[in-house]
Design a protein with these regions (language model features):
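A compositional/biophysical signature of low hydrophobicity enriched in polar/charged and small residues
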Residues: 1-88
Length: 88
């Protein structure tokens, strides 16, 4: 089972670029976005199971210097991916 997740990340002020670049180097991370609004960075990821997602968050993301908080949203269903509609 593949688990897709969107991770919402709060970063120490002035450190968004450093954190974004560090996250972009992680092979488990698919996309990294710097945002306006509530969160500083959002990343998308795909893991083989929830245990691997948990490990990614606790053992890698939370250890990146200047990451303050990670909030996770697990994708339940995808309606459109890469500009293609998905109907299952």
């Amino acid at each position: 089972m593949t688990v897709r997740a969107i991770l919402h990340i709060f970063v120490e002020p002035g450190k968004i670029e450093d954190v974004g670049e560090a996250l972009a180097k992680m092979p488990e991370i698919i996309d990294v976005y710097e945002l306006t609004g509530e969160y500083d960075i959002i990343v998308t990821t795909r893991t083989n199971d929830l245990h691997k997602l948990r490990s990614l968050i606790s053992e890698k993301l939370m250890r990146v210097h200047d990451v303050k908080v990670v909030t996770t949203s697990v994708v339940l269903h995808t309606y459109k991916l890469n500009s293609k509609e998905i109907f299952e």
